[in-house]
Amino acid sequence: MRLITGRLAAAALVSLFVLTWRAHVDQDVVVAQTRKPIMITRIYTGPDGQSRAEQVELKLNGGASEMIKATGVQFSSRPPAPASDWHVGPMRQYVITLSGRAELEVAGGKKIPVGPGHIDLVEDLTGKGHITKVLEDRVTLQLPLVDQTPRSN
């Protein structure tokens, strides 16, 4: 009797493990199928000298992007501040917001809300530039790119 009870208990534990594992795997599949693409806000200078913004999907091949060469890494912390004057990017770079909120403005009054996880590709190195307004303490990671030639539109 003890042997049968032990085997039933072991079978129940194995069944529970299999059901739990199966539910976890099914959940991972659903997450993978509904995963959103990684989007980047590209800020660039249009032919009229005005800064523009567009959403660009980061291409992933096998779950990773191609290697992007950067010249270094810089962290920046900024307190809330009124909107800056119009300015161009200092160099072609990625700016990734780690915490806080800001707002970018480009030509035509288009405003881009920026929060944690937001990625900007700053390419407006000439022309009128853009405005930055820090709304909450903002920490960013800046990755200046080796290739300083903005891609053509």
Regions found by a protein language model. Give the residues of each.
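Conserved short histidine dyad/triad with adjacent acidic residue
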Residues: 57-61, 71-89, 123-126, 147-148
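Short, conserved beta-strand element in jelly-roll/cupin
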Residues: 87-104, 144
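Short beta-strand His + acidic residue motifs that chelate non-heme Fe in jelly-roll/DSBH
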Residues: 104-105, 122-123, 128-135
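Short acidic-glycine-tyrosine-enriched beta hairpin
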Residues: 108-125
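Hydrophobic membrane-insertion alpha-helices, especially the h-region
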Residues: 9-18
